[in-house]
Amino acid sequence: MIGRTREQKQGGELSVEDIQDPFLVSIHIIADPGESKCLQEAIDRLLVWIHPDLQLFCVSERRVLKKKKPSKSFASHPALAIILFLQEDYGEEQILHLHKCFQKPPWQFHHTERVHGKFLPYMPCNQDFFTLANGTPLWAIRQVHYGKEIIRFTIYCSYENFADMMKMYELIIKKRVWRKKTDFCVFPVYSNMDFDIEFSLKRLVKGQKPVPLESSLLEFRVRDFGQLIPLLPNQCSPISEGRWKTEDHDGNKILLQQAQCLARKTAWKHQNYASRTAAMTQPLSIAPRSRKLKYGKHKARASHGQVQHFGGSQTDFPMGQVDTFRSLKFPSEAAQAFQRSKSLYCLPTMSTFPSCHSFPMSEPHPCFGLDTYETPAWRISPKINIDDLEGVEETDVDTGMKLSSSDLSVVSAYSPLNGPCSDLEASLPSEGALAQSDTVPGRQNHSSDSLHSVSDISSSPCPVFPSTPAQSQKHILSHYHQLSEITSHLSETLNIEEEEFYI
């Protein structure tokens, strides 16, 4: 844990609830002795396709080999799954590549489910689930045809406890449900221009029981322990300073880590960090060439309103920061991986707020033309800043004992405090320009009038447009009917595509 070694900076503090935290939800995976490195590398090879700095999983080793219990009955279902939604625009290459990765050790096939919507190219009617080892979460990849890429944590709930668990996790995450059905709901965790992190609950059918995972624990960063603990259904027990252990209604073990208030940086601190930015080596995101070629198309889709930004305003990627990244040269060296310790890790809290240049992912540099790539492209992504961590101490998940070695593989990287940059405001058209654009003949008079519905036009005994000939009115009515049919068709299409995310 991190002690508050610095004095409070002037300028106030920012609550954890007011900012987006990509590490709000993370997972501990406890492997048998000698297997942690293999399992960690297998997970990293998957997440690098979305972003390499998202160290949301940490695999550690237990001290003694645990005896394997006999498999549960067919009516049981592992309680935790991780689903990666990958963009179709990047091509089928990545889907096929990742599916081949699942065919190799340490991955093991678990089961297949029927899914809705458009399906994966290699399995036209089914969705395959895989696992790394006994007692670890299920994994699946899903191809999506619109929106952004998604990392989703899913808890499978018993039929009886679904409603209660939804209320419980809403208290812990402190975010409202974004999508909700009778047997499914999604909580937004983090969102930026490239990908989303989500937490979801899915209710199993009657008679099917979720099996809590013995080798995996979910960890949530919470703020007000005093208010939260009395509201939880089961007893909470402290395992270290600022960390508590409890269970949900289905018996899933979860860890709660206190996220303290984050002090704002002084202006001098920001200037000092900005002066060092150009000299820092930026880590690189591995991305195949197909992802690079489709990147512009994906951005265009998002800009046309097909992606709903949730979890707060999209101020985590100010335009000024984009300009900073564009001014940097392409690094000649690959990023070095964070050094991991073999102990069970702890997400550190922070005594000071990281710089505004900490986490948001940058867009591709404009000078990197597509025709210059002969090998798989690299996409620039700013390094998560760990320079400001002080006094990091690691604690064992089971014993709560403090450990001497520190593990900085997972750090809290918060979004910038600043709102939309002035550069963005300057690039937008002024009100005067918009007013001039509305002075086009034949447009100004209709701008303030509300459009009549098709039913109103059809049932109106007098002409809706008195100055329009009868033949022209028939043409207008026909045009409205066509628009109504198109709108209805688009609505049905969106409902079908929504099924892609129902898994």
Swiss-Prot record:
Domain of life: Eukaryota
Protein's name in the database: Protein FAM124A
Family annotation (PANTHER family): FAM124 DOMAIN-CONTAINING PROTEIN-RELATED, PROTEIN FAM124A
Lineage start: Eukaryota, Metazoa, Chordata, Craniata, Vertebrata
GN (gene name): fam124a
Sequence segments annotated as region (Disordered): 434-470
Feature: compositional bias, Low complexity: 447-460
InterPro entries: FAM124, FAM124_dom
Family named by the database record: Belongs to the FAM124 family.
Record field: compositional bias (Polar residues): 436-445
